[in-house]
Amino acid sequence: MRAPASGLTAFPAVPPDVRLIDLAWNEIAEVPGWVAGLAALEELRLDGNRLRSLPDLSGLTALRALHLDGNELASFPRCPPHLEVLFLYGNRVGAVPDRLSPGLRHLALGANGLTEVPGSLWKLTALESLNLAENALTEVPAVIGGLARLRMLDLGHNRLASVPPELGDLGLTDYLYLSDNLLAEVPEELGRLDRLAYLNLTDNRLTRLPESIGRMAGLVELRVYGNRLESLPGSIGALARLRELHLQGNRLERLPASIAGLEELRVLDLRNNRLRELPESLPAGLRHLDLRNNRLRSLPPVLPPLDKLDLRWNKLDGEPEVLRGLRERGCVILR
């Protein structure tokens, strides 16, 4: 039964053998008690409604997925033991119970005002994705390293001053968000995440990246903007699959020569740093290079065939000869 975004204000009647109910993005404020008796129900989608409470759903033994993002729930729902997907992003639950469905594979608890989570959460060994973003967490315990099947982890927008070395024990392949925290450093063990594709460390207090970052061979996109980096490790040039590197808003004065080895790099954002010079060679495949608001007085004699080069607010001595061809193609922004 599907009726998303239909302007419903009340839960409609459904067949007793219904397997899917999708009532997302309506104006429903209450779920009737009889829903707890829908023995065949496998998936219930109630995202974006006005729910403040739910009946006890623990008896729905067929239920595998429960979507409740964007409601007003003040307490954690009572769920069946075989539940695999639970999305509660953007509610007001405040606390997580000690007992959770042990078979959970996807769990979203972001934006709920959580200050801590129970130890039982870190024992959900079937988890593949975990979203704890936009809470008020101050620590992540070492036992997180036991979530061996985890592919996606979002800890962004919390109050973490550190993360445990055991993060490197995870099997993350898709993404790791640690943005908008209070991190002054990340552990060297992070380099063991050699299959991770996307790493976001933006808006922290990082003064350095670990040398081990060069071992993260699977990285396709790395975002470290809004930190306090003064230099980059030479090992960064070993990231053979990297396509986007976002370093804006740091304190970089120079780049390592090894950056030329990033053969797959297409986007390099270096605006709002303190660069005085660039390496003699830049990645040959680079297409977008943003150098706004640095302290450059000159450019290397050869540049890659860029589609866009932004050089505004630098201190260039005249217009370097190397820009002529790019200017003719309309690829350069100087002022």
Predicted regions and their residues:
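The feature encodes a structural signal of leucine-rich repeats
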Residues: 8-13, 31-34, 51-57, 73-78, ...
